[in-house]
A protein has these predicted regions:
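Amphipathic alpha-helical packing segments from all-alpha helical-bundle domains
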Residues: 121-147, 155-160, 183, 187-198
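Amphipathic alpha-helical segments used for helix-helix packing
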Residues: 103-125, 170-178
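Helix-turn-helix
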Residues: 20, 28-62, 66
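Alpha-helical DNA-contacting segments of helix-turn-helix folds
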Residues: 29, 63-71, 79, 112, ...
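Amphipathic C-terminal alpha-helical segment
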Residues: 162-180, 195-204
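Amphipathic alpha-helical linker/stalk segments
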Residues: 69-93, 123, 132-133, 138-142
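N-terminal intrinsically disordered/low-complexity leader segments
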Residues: 1-16, 203-205
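Hydrophobic alpha-helical connector segments
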Residues: 80-108, 148, 157-161
Length: 205
């Protein structure tokens, strides 16, 4: 085996180990939640040392961020698939798609918002931008529904609406004391969007 072949073999093994570590971390988060995730458990499941995990991702935060990036990508893919022909139906579709994703991937989505960097380090800019891009998907339909509003106000309203939808869904799925009953989440989300838009003066279709 020449040097090029040996290097290629090492690269393949490295990629396989990285993929395995990500999959194990994702599976553990999905089943038990982020707070139960331990680097030792990931390393043991992958039959490697803790040092190998750190070498691959820099630190444990690096592994969690990698899983969270993939979660945002999957969420955004689902949201962008919502038809955009009618802005009101699009907003309802975005809320419905978010509910579906949250119900199917509750712990993974929760991990995205629960994760705190070690030593209060700032989050990498790329994942912040990815999350903001997902939130911004409500911006385009709101612009169409509120054409006379200040663009900066509409951008802020889009973030506020997405935050409200996220909060309603998160509390509802966790069945918190003040939450909307899970069985009525879809119905009451639709009512919230209609009521909120009416308060903003958006036309009814």
């Amino acid at each position: 085996m020449n040097n090029v072949q040996e290097e290629s073999r090492r690269d393949r093994k490295k990629l396989q180990r990285r993929t395995l570590l990500i999959e194990i971390a994702r599976r553990l988060i999905a089943s038990k939640g982020l707070r139960s995730l331990k680097v030792r458990d990931v390393a043991e499941a992958a039959s490697c040392s803790i040092g190998s995990v750190y070498n691959e991702f820099g630190d444990f935060d690096g592994l969690i961020l990698t899983v969270n990036r993939e979660t945002v990508q999957a969420l955004t893919a689902g949201l962008t698939a919502v038809p955009a022909d009618d802005p009101l139906r699009q907003l309802h579709g975005l809320a419905d798609a978010y509910l579906g994703f949250a119900a199917e991937h509750a712990n993974l989505l929760r991990a995205l918002f629960e994760h705190r960097m070690e030593d209060d380090r700032p989050f990498p800019e790329d994942i912040l931008a990815m999350v903001m891009d997902a939130f911004a998907l409500m911006h385009a339909p709101l612009v169409r529904l509120l054409p006379d509003r200040d663009p900066d106000d509409v951008a802020l309203l889009a973030r506020m609406m997405f935050s409200a939808v996220h909060g309603i869904i998160s509390l509802g799925l966790e069945e918190r004391m003040v939450a909307v009953p899970p069985a009525r989440l879809r119905e009451l989300l639709a009512q919230f969007i209609d009521t909120h838009l009416a308060g903003l003066g958006a036309p009814r279709s």
